[in-house]
């Protein structure tokens, strides 16, 4: 299964193609992605982050083996071939254990890598950029690279032990700021300099040599950099190709390497395409997909209020608000301002902290209630036009069934379509 290496080879040969990575564990988002890839006959890259999924369960409660089982079961149920499915691990390193001494955090990171590789994840992002409890801030390139090389060695040994061959594909480096959208209001963003990118690569090459890992260098397919794209709660910093041109040209000197861009959510279709052309050819997307899910659910909740007596309604939006207020740990440190500003952010922020709450049993029950209420009889077309106008066009043309589930999935697929088009190449 060398989809990624082949994509990089084609890109380096001038095809201007790429691949997008779906970074979500939500079943409806994953179903939308699997069905979209199936319809377009493309491989599908699905990634779990070290926050979501780890050897202790992460915030989803899933280990890497659990996550793989969950995704593969869904793929099987949708007749999607498993050899077209690529699983990736994102920001794998001591990220979850920064409050521990480095020795302890890295021991946990070793086990994290083992658990991802043993579970069959093939795209491994090694990220040891974060300082642990007893580390200097920031870490030097050399320390970051030494730790990444240590984890690469663990990964290679684990892969050979479990699968009899070493066929992992690696991503190194990190973006600034932190994963998952910026906390503060942004106006402009520093693009990674070519010198900084070169220094990261050279430090890693040297560290890998010291670990006897020269042979895996061609399988290091991408470097994570900041091309100047980011979003905060209400704003998006759009890609400006001129500012990233020196960085873009620099990677042309490396035969088997492209860039990976994080936080590409909410970029325009034109910006996504230009990113791929400029060699930022792995595009990560996550919050934009759960944002689309949330949009569709809010629209369906509004339709429900028009059609169903108040006492029989699901009350999804109120249930969501009540649970978020009752358990504020996922949004409290991110959303600021007065009560109204925080209320709006909880519902509508681009950073989409609401995504952490969908698995809650009360919210899931309200979601199921909403779908039941709207599945009993056809949704009137004028209401679909009012609240889901993009889906209305497809319903009218006969290409989309106007059921709650299909409307949600299609709304998510509108975002996936932008990424697919950006990555198609010439």
From Swiss-Prot:
SUPFAM superfamilies registered for this protein in UniProt: Aldolase (SSF51569)
Gene3D superfamilies xref list: Aldolase class I (3.20.20.70), putative tagatose 6-phosphate kinase domain like (1.10.400.20)
Listed pathway(s): Carbohydrate metabolism; D-tagatose 6-phosphate degradation; D-glyceraldehyde 3-phosphate and glycerone phosphate from D-tagatose 6-phosphate: step 2/2
GO biological process, one term: D-tagatose 6-phosphate catabolic process
GO cellular component, one term: plasma membrane
GO molecular function: enzyme activator activity
Signal peptide positions (record): none
Subunit structure: Forms a complex with KbaY.
Function text: Component of the tagatose-1,6-bisphosphate aldolase KbaYZ that is required for full activity and stability of the Y subunit. Could have a chaperone-like function for the proper and stable folding of KbaY. When expressed alone, KbaZ does not show any aldolase activity.
UniProt similarity note: Belongs to the GatZ/KbaZ family. KbaZ subfamily.
Further comment: In contrast to E.coli strains C and EC3132, K-12 strains cannot grow on N-acetylgalactosamine and D-galactosamine, because they carry a deletion and thus lack active PTS systems specific for these compounds. Therefore, KbaYZ in K-12 strains is not involved in the degradation of these compounds.
PANTHER family for the chain: D-TAGATOSE-1,6-BISPHOSPHATE ALDOLASE SUBUNIT KBAZ (PTHR32502:SF2), N-ACETYLGALACTOSAMINE PERMEASE II COMPONENT-RELATED (PTHR32502)
Stated name of the protein: D-tagatose-1,6-bisphosphate aldolase subunit KbaZ
Organism annotation: Escherichia coli (strain K12)
Protein's gene: kbaZ
């Amino acid at each position: 299964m060398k989809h990624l290496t082949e994509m990089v080879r084609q890109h380096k040969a001038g095809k201007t193609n790429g691949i997008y990575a779906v970074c979500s564990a939500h079943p409806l988002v994953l179903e939308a992605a699997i069905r979209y890839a199936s319809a377009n006959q493309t491989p599908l890259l699905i990634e779990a982050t070290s926050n979501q999924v780890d050897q202790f369960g992460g915030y989803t409660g899933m280990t890497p083996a659990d996550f793989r089982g969950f995704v593969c079961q869904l793929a099987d149920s949708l007749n999607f071939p498993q050899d077209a499915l690529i699983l990736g691990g994102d920001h794998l390193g001591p990220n979850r254990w920064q409050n521990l001494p480095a020795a302890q955090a890295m021991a946990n990171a070793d086990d994290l890598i083992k658990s991802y590789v043993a579970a069959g994840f093939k795209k491994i992002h090694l990220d040891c950029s974060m300082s642990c409890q007893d580390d200097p801030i920031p870490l030097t390139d050399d320390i970051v690279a030494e730790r990444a090389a240590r984890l690469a060695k663990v990964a290679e040994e684990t892969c050979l032990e479990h699968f009899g061959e070493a066929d992992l594909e690696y991503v190194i480096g990190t973006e600034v700021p932190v994963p998952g959208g910026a906390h503060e209001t942004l106006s402009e963003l520093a693009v990674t300099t070519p010198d900084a990118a070169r220094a990261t690569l050279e430090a890693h090459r040297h560290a890998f040599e010291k670990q006897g890992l020269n042979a895996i260098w061609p399988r290091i397919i991408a470097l994570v950099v900041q091309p100047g794209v980011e979003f905060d709660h209400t704003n998006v910093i759009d890609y400006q190709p001129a500012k990233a041109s020196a960085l873009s040209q620099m990677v042309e000197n490396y035969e088997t390497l492209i860039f990976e861009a994080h936080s590409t959510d909410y970029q325009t279709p034109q910006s996504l395409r230009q990113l791929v052309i400029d060699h930022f050819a792995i595009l990560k997307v996550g919050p934009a997909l759960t944002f689309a899910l949330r949009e569709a659910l809010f629209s369906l909740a509004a339709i429900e209020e028009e059609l169903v007596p108040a006492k029989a309604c699901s009350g999804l939006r109120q249930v969501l608000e009540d649970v978020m207020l009752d358990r504020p740990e996922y949004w409290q440190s991110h959303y600021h301002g007065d009560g109204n500003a925080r209320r709006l952010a909880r519902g509508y922020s681009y950073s989409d902290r609401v995504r952490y709450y969908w698995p809650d049993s009360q919210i899931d029950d309200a979601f199921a209630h909403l779908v039941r209420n709207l599945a009993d009889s056809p949704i009137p077309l004028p209401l679909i036009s009012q609240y889901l106008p993009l889906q209305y066009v497809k319903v009218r043309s006969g290409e989309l069934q106007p059921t709650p589930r299909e409307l949600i999935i299609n709304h998510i697929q509108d975002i996936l379509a932008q990424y697919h088009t950006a990555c198609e190449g010439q």
